[in-house]
Amino acid sequence: MAGNNFTEVTVFILSGFANHPELQVSLFLMFLFIYLFTVLGNLGLITLIRMDSQLHTPMYFFLSNLAFIDIFYSSTVTPKALVNFQSNRRSISFVGCFVQMYFFVGLVCCECFLLGSMAYNRYIAICNPLLYSVVMSQKVSNWLGVMPYVIGFTSSLISVWVISSLAFCDSSINHFFCDTTALLALSCVDTFGTEMVSFVLAGFTLLSSLLIITVTYIIIISAILRIQSAAGRQKAFSTCASHLMAVTIFYGSLIFTYLQPDNTSSLTQAQVASVFYTIVIPMLNPLIYSLRNKDVKNALLRVIHRKLFP
């Protein structure tokens, strides 16, 4: 991949946050706590959905996929960051760097389109409830669950291929993981074409999935406003409030970080935003989708009751 490099780079140094040695212990503890909470919270949600038959619906099928993605896209970055906080080397191999980038970018893209699938599911449930079981069949649900992975990892493969083909003059990545913008800054050659490819792919992923979600919610909100009773409107809105909150947080942080082709944001801002969507959002998702969800709470009570009183 690096055959055209002026200097053969075999190892990168992840120097993000290295200029704040007084924060290394605090950052290590914060990352560790959030990562453990993320893994346990999302694994718990997946396990609960599998154990309770009343949650075997398309909505919770998508939610278990979201939890799976959150575990693994956090795991592509956080464990290596934890090691680096306790190490003086902070190194990652050339291949390891692009493998990390491939899975991270791919899983983030997967989450974008999976959130779109979840929005479509809410649209059918609210706007066409009588046809829900017909429209959201097992085949359709599986298709809506698989396609985000296909699109996400295809997009990621293209992005990683064009960036890994660049010539790199430096091996010090000013970030805590192999981020696309930080790697582009190390190139010896003109990166305009590569930046445009990355920008178009990011724009397609973010804007196309966000367009699907936006149009879907315009229709949903219009349908909710036509409901006569206040109680009915409240019940309908409560079924999609958690998803809408998760979408707002996730897309807001991604757009702030990546949809800036002129690279006007500082690297410090990018790192702070990256911390948020890399480790914080995967932790928040199980809380957002479970604390306000009566079905999940009731399922947890049923599982506990079965275990205590078999």
UniProtKB/Swiss-Prot annotation:
<feature type="transmembrane region" description="Helical; Name=3">
    <location>
        <begin position="100"/>
        <end position="120"/>
    </location>
</feature>
<feature type="transmembrane region" description="Helical; Name=1">
    <location>
        <begin position="26"/>
        <end position="46"/>
    </location>
</feature>
<feature type="disulfide bond">
    <location>
        <begin position="97"/>
        <end position="188"/>
    </location>
</feature>
<dbReference type="GO" id="GO:0005549">
    <property type="term" value="F:odorant binding"/>
</dbReference>
<dbReference type="Pfam" id="PF13853">
    <property type="entry name" value="7tm_4"/>
</dbReference>
<dbReference type="GO" id="GO:0005886">
    <property type="term" value="C:plasma membrane"/>
</dbReference>
<keyword id="KW-0812">Transmembrane</keyword>
<dbReference type="GO" id="GO:0004984">
    <property type="term" value="F:olfactory receptor activity"/>
</dbReference>
<feature type="transmembrane region" description="Helical; Name=6">
    <location>
        <begin position="237"/>
        <end position="257"/>
    </location>
</feature>
<feature type="topological domain" description="Extracellular">
    <location>
        <begin position="161"/>
        <end position="196"/>
    </location>
</feature>
<comment type="similarity">
    <text>Belongs to the G-protein coupled receptor 1 family.</text>
</comment>
<feature type="topological domain" description="Cytoplasmic">
    <location>
        <begin position="47"/>
        <end position="54"/>
    </location>
</feature>
<feature type="transmembrane region" description="Helical; Name=7">
    <location>
        <begin position="271"/>
        <end position="291"/>
    </location>
</feature>
<keyword id="KW-0472">Membrane</keyword>
<protein>
    <recommendedName>
        <fullName>Olfactory receptor 8I2</fullName>
    </recommendedName>
</protein>
<feature type="transmembrane region" description="Helical; Name=5">
    <location>
        <begin position="197"/>
        <end position="216"/>
    </location>
</feature>
<dbReference type="GO" id="GO:0007608">
    <property type="term" value="P:sensory perception of smell"/>
</dbReference>
<feature type="glycosylation site" description="N-linked (GlcNAc...) asparagine">
    <location>
        <position position="5"/>
    </location>
</feature>
<keyword id="KW-0552">Olfaction</keyword>
<keyword id="KW-0297">G-protein coupled receptor</keyword>
<feature type="topological domain" description="Extracellular">
    <location>
        <begin position="1"/>
        <end position="25"/>
    </location>
</feature>
<feature type="topological domain" description="Cytoplasmic">
    <location>
        <begin position="121"/>
        <end position="139"/>
    </location>
</feature>
<dbReference type="GO" id="GO:0007186">
    <property type="term" value="P:G protein-coupled receptor signaling pathway"/>
</dbReference>
<dbReference type="InterPro" id="IPR017452">
    <property type="entry name" value="GPCR_Rhodpsn_7TM"/>
</dbReference>
<feature type="transmembrane region" description="Helical; Name=2">
    <location>
        <begin position="55"/>
        <end position="75"/>
    </location>
</feature>
<comment type="function">
    <text>Odorant receptor.</text>
</comment>
<keyword id="KW-0325">Glycoprotein</keyword>
<feature type="topological domain" description="Cytoplasmic">
    <location>
        <begin position="292"/>
        <end position="310"/>
    </location>
</feature>
<dbReference type="InterPro" id="IPR000276">
    <property type="entry name" value="GPCR_Rhodpsn"/>
</dbReference>
<keyword id="KW-0675">Receptor</keyword>
<dbReference type="GO" id="GO:0004930">
    <property type="term" value="F:G protein-coupled receptor activity"/>
</dbReference>
<keyword id="KW-0807">Transducer</keyword>
<feature type="topological domain" description="Cytoplasmic">
    <location>
        <begin position="217"/>
        <end position="236"/>
    </location>
</feature>
<dbReference type="InterPro" id="IPR000725">
    <property type="entry name" value="Olfact_rcpt"/>
</dbReference>
<feature type="topological domain" description="Extracellular">
    <location>
        <begin position="76"/>
        <end position="99"/>
    </location>
</feature>
<feature type="topological domain" description="Extracellular">
    <location>
        <begin position="258"/>
        <end position="270"/>
    </location>
</feature>
<keyword id="KW-1003">Cell membrane</keyword>
<keyword id="KW-1133">Transmembrane helix</keyword>
<keyword id="KW-0716">Sensory transduction</keyword>
<feature type="transmembrane region" description="Helical; Name=4">
    <location>
        <begin position="140"/>
        <end position="160"/>
    </location>
</feature>
<keyword id="KW-1015">Disulfide bond</keyword>
